[in-house]
A protein has these predicted regions:
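Helical segment within the ABC ATPase nucleotide-binding domain
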Residues: 114-126
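Conserved ABC ATPase signature
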Residues: 74-81
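H-loop/switch region of ABC-family ATPase nucleotide-binding domains
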Residues: 134-135
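Catalytic Walker B motif of ABC-type/P-loop ATPase nucleotide-binding domains
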Residues: 99-103
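A short, surface-exposed alpha-helical micro-motif characterized by mixed small hydrophobic
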Residues: 140-142
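Conserved ABC ATPase "signature" region
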Residues: 43, 47, 53-70
Length: 181
């Protein structure tokens, strides 16, 4: 990753332990330990982040993403969609103040996509900063506040929902990139 300047998370140096404890990341390609179960992945993250999430809250997250009956499945037994759900649950289990989701809906079934959108709106209502990187603009149509458009690794423009009203995201994207409308 090449960049100029500094990166901060809630006014903390991004590499600091304090910043890492409030920051969650859901990668585009979830990485799972083959020999750990779904539950062990959750517990691993809870301990690594010294999370104060309760067992009841963990169960509620697993239930929302239909993983309660998959807790004993090993990482190497899961489909891409299931791994994505586990990755999302792990991120939520640290109770982040900032969360970065990279193509989070790829591989998810329609019900899980709907659930993730609801979770994102709940996080937003609770003051969590949410960053979503996606090429599937229609997936974030009803949940975005600010859109940055990148081209060749550089931000070429941005919009806020307040500025553009009901204009569709793909129209805004094409406006910036000069593509088809």
């Amino acid at each position: 990753l090449r960049y100029e300047g500094g990166i901060g998370i809630q006014k903390m140096e991004a590499h600091s332990m304090e910043a890492k404890k409030i920051f969650a990341y859901v990668p585009e390609l979830p990485a799972m330990f083959d020999a750990l179960t779904v539950r062990e992945h959750i517990e691993y993250v809870r301990k690594a982040y010294d999370s104060n999430i309760t067992d009841q809250e963990v169960e509620a997250i697993l239930t929302r993403f239909e993983l309660e009956d998959k807790q004993d499945k090993l990482g190497n037994e899961l489909s891409k969609g299931m791994m994505q759900k586990v990755s999302i649950c792990c991120a939520l289990c640290i109770k982040p103040q900032v969360i970065l989701l990279d193509e989070p809906m790829v591989g998810l079934d329609p019900k899980a996509i709907k659930e993730l959108k609801e979770v994102i709106l709940e996080l937003k209502e609770n003051g969590v900063t949410i960053l979503i990187s996606t090429h599937m603009l229609e997936m974030v149509e009803n949940i975005w506040d600010v859109m940055f458009v990148m081209e060749k690794g550089h931000i070429i423009g941005s919009y806020s929902k307040e500025e553009v009203g009901d204009k569709e995201l793909d129209a805004l994207f094409f406006e910036l990139t000069g593509g088809e409308k």
